[in-house]
Swiss-Prot record:
Keyword Transport listed: no
Organism: Mycobacterium marinum (strain ATCC BAA-535 / M)
InterPro entries with a match to the protein in the record: Kinase-like_dom_sf, Mak_N_cap
Subunit details: Monomer.
Any single Pfam family the record assigns to this protein: Mak_N_cap
Family: Belongs to the aminoglycoside phosphotransferase family.
GO biological process, one term: carbohydrate phosphorylation
Molecular functions (GO terms): ATP binding; kinase activity
EC numbers for this chain: 2.7.1.175
Function per UniProt: Catalyzes the ATP-dependent phosphorylation of maltose to maltose 1-phosphate. Is involved in a branched alpha-glucan biosynthetic pathway from trehalose, together with TreS, GlgE and GlgB.
Designated name of the protein: Maltokinase
Amino acid sequence: MNSPATLAAKLPWSEWLPQQRWYAGRNRELAAAEPGAVVALRDDLDLVLVDVSYTDGSAERYQVLVRWDAGPVSEFSTLATIGSADDHTGFDALYDPVAPQVLLSLIDSSAVRSSSDGQVSFAREPDVELPLDAYPRVSDAEQSNTSVIFDRGQAAILKVFRRVSSGINPDIELNRVLGRAHNPHVARLLGTYEIGIPGEPPEAACPLGMATAYAANAAEGWAMATASVRDLFAEGDLYAHEVGGDFAGESRRLGEAVASVHATLAEQLGTAQATFPVDHVLARLSSTAAAVPELQQYAGTIEERFVKLVDETISVQRVHGDLHLGQVLRTPESWVLIDFEGEPGQPLRERRAPDSPLRDVAGVLRSFEYAAYGPLVDHADDKQLAARAREWITRNRTAFCEGYAAASGNDPRDSELLLAAYELDKAVYEAGYESRHRPGWLPIPLRSIARLTAT
């Protein structure tokens, strides 16, 4: 068998990568895709970093684990087959039951694997156990990474980063801080792995993945909230608090959990004073309004709201950065926050920058609106449903803020103008996203923007 680097270079990366759901270059023209680093983890398993360049001059690096000549689970054979190189066939190893177990074992033993392209270092967290004999399955969640679940005994989930870059990964960083501080509202970090490139300083190492405790028997917040909305809509003669699926109690407990996480991050990593990020939100508003004609009628009012806060002093700290109901899980014991990676698509420096806790609060409040208004996308003229949706939103907003206030001593509603500004900034971001990816959902953020700019 040829060297790992030689074989990896012969795989048809330019054809395979664009078919993957975690590939971020769909709106750009691919110029080239070729391995930039290859490290053998064992004889038939290689870690490959694929360097992708685009005709607009931008570039990205993706992680793919390649298993040679061993087919994946049959249902994933088309998705996982990268292609042929000489007389060998390469597969995305995460869809093969053996390879994820190898990765978990390497983390458990804090192993090191090297080649001329780099050194891959695996590290287990102190005093943890990994389910080495558990059968892995790839999560079907739509996301920018690939997660493999080991659901047996001390269950774990291995998150393999796909688009990678050097520097401290905020998901690893904050999970480690919160776990070592024994905060009950995060899944405990079990281990990590990263690659160091020859000639680069240690701090330039590139994080590649992390294993955390798996929240077995957990329900996603989004699924719970949307089920509650469906129950309310089905009971036309009952108020929200009278419906069996009322979510307000969970919203209050979620507010308490978010406040707890914020308190731990402030205690462990500190706080500072800053001014409201007017330049940042105005830049987003300008670029989004230029791309979304439906937003332009509100742009002037939004700009006025932002500019009024130009001298506003705010307390900043490390926060989740992209909090919504899809980033929280309800276990039998409590709410758990996951995916501390920050806002998708932002540079690492910005994703690790301190921010106001109100950004996370606004993210949850915006998510309540999505949960309630989502069913109205196909019933835009149903005023009764719209009124029911607003009732549900108001009840759950109130419950969440009350829970946050009870746990932290600070009621987000006391910072009314700031909170509204963070909600507006989030809704502007959503308008840009929906315009590009789900035009039918664009009315959801626009409805909220109309409400926020009218008050």
